[in-house]
A protein has these predicted regions:
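Outer-membrane beta-barrel translocator domains and adjoining extracellular loop/strand segments
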Residues: 116, 148-149, 179-191, 237-254, ...
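Short, acidic, small-residue-rich periplasmic hinge/interaction motif at the N-terminus
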Residues: 1-45, 65-66, 74, 106-108
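Transmembrane beta-barrel wall of Gram-negative outer-membrane proteins
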Residues: 147-180, 191-239, 267-271, 277, ...
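Outer-membrane beta-barrel signature, preferentially recognizing the C-terminal barrel domain
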Residues: 369-375, 415-418, 446-500, 517-539
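Extracytoplasmic beta-strand/coil segments of soluble accessory domains associated
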Residues: 53-85
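N-terminal periplasmic accessory domains that precede
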Residues: 4-12, 52-55, 89-90, 105, ...
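Face-selective signature of the C-terminal outer-membrane beta-barrel domain
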Residues: 209-234, 259-409, 430-439, 492, ...
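Short acidic/polar hinge/loop motifs at secondary-structure boundaries
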Residues: 58, 84-110
């Protein structure tokens, strides 16, 4: 300004028309590296998926429905959240899709993971910025065409001050779901027996869980934290009936109805302590878990069966089961840059103590069980990864020792007590070619028979089916070569596996009674299997 207003800054009003601003979420990015497929969730359309189940069901190679999570061709995965193994299913319930940064799916886990692991899902959450107090609350209800009602509510609170973070979480849910199955069992002897069952059950579950956590971030490279969780299922209910018939050479010989009423309760306590940091160039990742659980179950079965031209017969079977479990597990991974790549050396140890009591009335039908198992697992592993231009290579080797001791009514059972020691190599290559990403990996996994399938006793299932174990089972080992390809919203997988000593279930005649099947596990002949999968996830609009 001039004159007497010289040196005075004057602001003059003006107006500008802003153009229309459209904010769009992008397609999720997919990265193939180190044996896994990583999908970016943050700032993509997947952020709007809602619950973790809805999110995981939209991740390539994953199916998540009705509380069941599976990796295609591999089965139920082990889940890690921010590098820590999830041991309580309710941990997923406290997350939602808008909290997630990325999800990695590993269909062929390498040396870092327990050899019994078929698949791994690693979930990384967003880091919340800023200090102060905050909370979020969510509630949801559902009602389907079969009159199944359910719903949940959750509250998550946190307080942050500089590097300190305190958190508290509470969750409650009530769910109702059907369990419907139609089964047919054929037994070929001197005559052909055909058993047909139509099962219509309803499961009802009530859940309450809570969690307290504390963490402190010393700097960008070092953080320490601990958490304590509680889970309670005050009601685990199954009600319903099974209707069946028995045919002999296509002639009806018997009809039956089984009315089932089951009530259970379960309680879990767990805690975790972790440290992630660096000392110079040495990276340290340590965590330890403690887990305790106790559960009981009462099962009442009212059976009515009638042979042709005979009177109706009735049998009431009552059984009770109680379980008590303890677990402590620790794992440490040390990493260091070496020869242009990254070398990781690690070890882990876990100890499990399980107690099971099973009683049945009348006890002439099957054996009462009072058993205990002590299982120790120790492992050491090494992995090395390096980039050669666009080509990424990761190689690993793991040694695992498992020792479990089985006690029947306090008596040590040598036949069912086992010690295993095995080596497991792994190797993966990944490389982008233009817009196409490709990955080739090799790994092996093992299915060791647990004490329950090694048992000698017989357990009553229903009037026509008993169950037992097989003390002579050996471990099933699968060696897999997997090829993955990703292009925009398309992913493709081709897997070849060689399975040695596969474990599967068979049904035999029980005590020369063709109408009663005895189910048990056996080892079959080795076989080869090839599977492929194509996932298309385009986004419209």
């Amino acid at each position: 300004c001039a004159g007497e207003n010289a040196g005075v800054i004057k602001m003059v009003a003006d107006s500008k028309m802003l153009g229309e601003v459209v904010v769009k979420s992008s397609l999720p990015k997919t990265i193939l590296k180190n044996g896994g497929i990583t999908t970016t969730v943050a700032e993509s359309v997947l952020e709007k998926a809602g619950t973790m189940e809805h999110l995981l069901d939209r991740i390539p190679n994953v199916s998540a429905q009705n509380g069941n999570i599976a990796v295609f061709g591999r089965g139920e995965p082990i889940i890690y959240i921010n590098g820590r193994q999830m041991r309580d299913r309710s941990e997923l319930d406290r997350l939602s899709s808008d909290n997630i940064k990325s999800v990695e799916v590993i269909s062929n886990p390498g040396a870092r993971y327990a050899a019994s692991t078929k698949a791994v899902i690693r979930i990384t959450t967003k880091k919340i910025q800023g200090d102060g107090f905050g909370f979020d609350a969510t509630t949801e209800g559902s009602y389907d065409e079969k009159k199944n009602m359910g719903g949940y509510g959750r509250l998550n609170m946190y307080y942050r001050k500089q590097g300190l973070e305190l958190g508290a979480y509470a969750y409650g849910a009530k769910q109702s779901s059907p369990d419907e199955k139609d089964l047919q069992q054929m037994t070929y002897l001197d005559k052909t027996w055909n058993q047909q069952d139509k099962t219509r059950w309803k499961n009802k579950t009530e859940t309450f869980s809570s969690r307290l956590n504390i963490s402190y971030q010393f700097d960008n490279n070092n953080s320490l934290g601990a958490s304590f969780s509680f889970l309670r299922n005050p009601k685990l209910i199954t009600d319903g009936k099974t209707e069946g018939s028995v045919l002999r050479d296509e002639d009806l010989t018997e009809t039956n109805t089984s009315i089932r009423s089951e009530f259970g309760q379960n309680s879990n306590l767990s805690s975790n302590i972790y440290y992630v940091g660096k000392v110079g160039k040495l990276g340290i990742d340590f965590n330890t878990d403690w887990f305790w659980s106790k559960g009981n179950n009462k099962n009442n079965i009212d059976e009515h069966y009638q042979e042709v031209n005979s009177d109706m017969q009735n049998q009431l079977v009552n059984s009770t089961t109680s379980k008590y479990n303890r677990l402590i597990a620790s794992k440490i991974v040390l990493s260091y840059p070496l020869l242009g790549g990254d070398l990781s050396v690690g070890g882990e140890y876990s100890f499990t103590n399980r107690n099971t009591n099973y009683a049945i009335i009348p006890n002439t039908l099957a054996d009462n069980v009072r058993d205990r198992i002590k299982e120790g697992m120790s492992a050491a592993f090494v992995t090395y990864s390096r980039d050669f231009g666009k080509l990424n290579m990761e190689a690993g080797l793991r040694y695992e020792n498992v020792d479990f001791k089985y006690y029947d009514d306090g008596k040590y059972m040598a036949e069912q007590s086992k010690t295993y020691g095995d080596w497991f190599p792994s190797l993966s290559f990944s490389m982008p070619i233009g817009n196409v990403q490709m990955q080739l990996s090799y790994a092996a996994d093992i299915d060791r028979p647990n004490y329950w399938v090694l048992r000698s006793g017989v357990q009553y299932s229903n009037h026509y089916t008993y169950e037992t174990g097989n003390p002579f089972l050996v471990s099933e080992i699968s060696r897999d070569i997997s090829y993955d390809l990703a292009y925009k919203w398309l992913t493709f997988n081709l897997t070849y596996e060689h399975v040695s000593d596969p474990i599967y279930q068979t049904v035999e005649m029980y005590k020369d009674n063709a109408t009663i099947g005895l189910m048990r596990m056996i080892n079959g002949k080795s076989y080869n299997n090839v599977s492929s999968m194509l996932t298309l996830q385009p986004t419209f609009g």
